[in-house]
């Protein structure tokens, strides 16, 4: 399996520098990762650096809390689209979900999907804050609202992806919607476990280390 083509090579920390974003892009080119995932201020830089390559530029929407207004999330998408973003990783409004305001959660996602105009939208449900029932409901709403992927985590919450959560999300969304595992995936064994559980996209900042481990293993 071409594990590199499952990876969104990610740098979202608050103090990420221009130099670090350029390094991220260089690594993505070297390993032919599927995409880089950066905060939206760095979309133009990443797009320019990766021009002419197969590496896509993904960015975050409503990140990391998910609690910004729906119209603001939609505007973030529109702005990032103008600047060359290919994919969007949005955070749901977790508080609305836990308040059982499911219609608002659906509309929030649907407006982002609409603004993206057919580009890939990954919906982060932030599993660390949810019960299993809430994870199922969130995954169902995301699928119904037009998400292309349901994603486990921002990496900024109290926990990241687990095999159990990936399996649960996959069981809800079925085979036709993607599942992205992210948060705490720092070695090849964890990446493989997530893929075996049903993930078909991986968000990681330790992607180079993972690829070197896979190379040594002969994968």
UniProtKB/Swiss-Prot annotation:
GO terms for molecular function: deoxyribose-phosphate aldolase activity. It is found in: Cytoplasm. Its EC number is 4.1.2.4. The keyword Cytoplasm applies. It comes from the Bacteria. The active site is at 89 (proton donor/acceptor), 151 (schiff-base intermediate with acetaldehyde), 180 (proton donor/acceptor). Belongs to the DeoC/FbaB aldolase family. DeoC type 1 subfamily. This is Deoxyribose-phosphate aldolase. It comes from Coprothermobacter proteolyticus (strain ATCC 35245 / DSM 5265 / OCM 4 / BT). The gene is deoC.
């Amino acid at each position: 399996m071409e594990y590199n083509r499952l990876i969104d090579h990610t740098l979202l920390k608050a103090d990420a520098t221009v130099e670090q974003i350029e390094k991220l892009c260089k690594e993505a080119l070297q390993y032919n990762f599927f995409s880089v995932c950066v905060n939206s201020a760095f979309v133009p830089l990443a797009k320019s650096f990766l021009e002419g390559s197969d590496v896509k530029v993904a960015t975050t929407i409503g990140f990391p809390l998910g609690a910004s207004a729906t119209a603001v999330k939609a505007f973030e998408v529109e702005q990032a689209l103008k600047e060359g973003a290919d994919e969007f990783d949005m955070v749901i409004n977790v508080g609305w979900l836990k308040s059982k305001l499911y219609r608002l959660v659906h509309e929030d996602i649907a407006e982002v999907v609409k603004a993206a105009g057919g580009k890939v939208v990954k919906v982060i449900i932030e599993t660390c804050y949810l019960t299993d029932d809430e994870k199922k409901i969130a995954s169902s709403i995301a699928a119904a609202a037009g998400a292309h992927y349901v994603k486990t985590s921002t990496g900024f919450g109290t926990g990241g992806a687990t095999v159990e959560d990936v399996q649960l999300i996959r069981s809800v969304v079925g085979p036709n919607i993607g599942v992205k595992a992210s948060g705490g995936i720092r070695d090849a064994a964890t990446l493989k476990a997530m893929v075996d559980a049903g993930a078909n996209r991986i968000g990681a900042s330790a992607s180079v280390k993972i690829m070197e481990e896979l190379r040594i293993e002969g994968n």
